């Protein structure tokens, strides 16, 4: 659980980095239009403004234009090797920005696999 002090530090850092270049987080029109490389299996999906997501985004120096966009936390790519469900036992999503490794994926929409 994120402590109040860690959240306060992250919020301060987030405010300090507000001058950084905004990230484009456009969402796909429909889940069936999701590029295979954008399909992720995330242990948690929440709004970017939520405590844990805001903390991670702040520490990474990421400034979003829309703080209500969905982000995935602790994600891994969905592969067909995992079986009929694509190997996802958590939340399957299509995310526009997966450039932060498994830590966080930005601009996510739920998909059915």
Curated annotation (Swiss-Prot):
Q: Where in the cell is it found?
A: Secreted; Secreted, Cell wall
Glycan attachment residues as annotated in the record: 35, 97
SS bonds (residue pairs): 34-94, 41-88, 42-75, 95-108
- Alphabetic keyword roster: Cell wall, Disulfide bond, Glycoprotein, Secreted, Signal
**Would you say which domain of life the source belongs to?**
Eukaryota
Recorded GO molecular functions are: structural constituent of cell wall
Keyword Glycoprotein listed? The answer is yes
Q: Name one Pfam family in it.
A: Hydrophobin
GO CC annotation, single = fungal-type cell wall
Enumerate the InterPro entries for this protein. Hydrophobin
Q: Which family does it belong to?
A: Belongs to the fungal hydrophobin family.
Biological role stated in the UniProt entry:
Aerial growth, conidiation, and dispersal of filamentous fungi in the environment rely upon a capability of their secreting small amphipathic proteins called hydrophobins (HPBs) with low sequence identity. Class I can self-assemble into an outermost layer of rodlet bundles on aerial cell surfaces, conferring cellular hydrophobicity that supports fungal growth, development and dispersal; whereas Class II form highly ordered films at water-air interfaces through intermolecular interactions but contribute nothing to the rodlet structure.
Whom does it interact with, and what assembly results?
Self-assembles to form functional amyloid fibrils called rodlets. Self-assembly into fibrillar rodlets occurs spontaneously at hydrophobic:hydrophilic interfaces and the rodlets further associate laterally to form amphipathic monolayers.
Name assigned to this protein: Class I hydrophobin fvh1
Name the gene behind this protein: fvh1
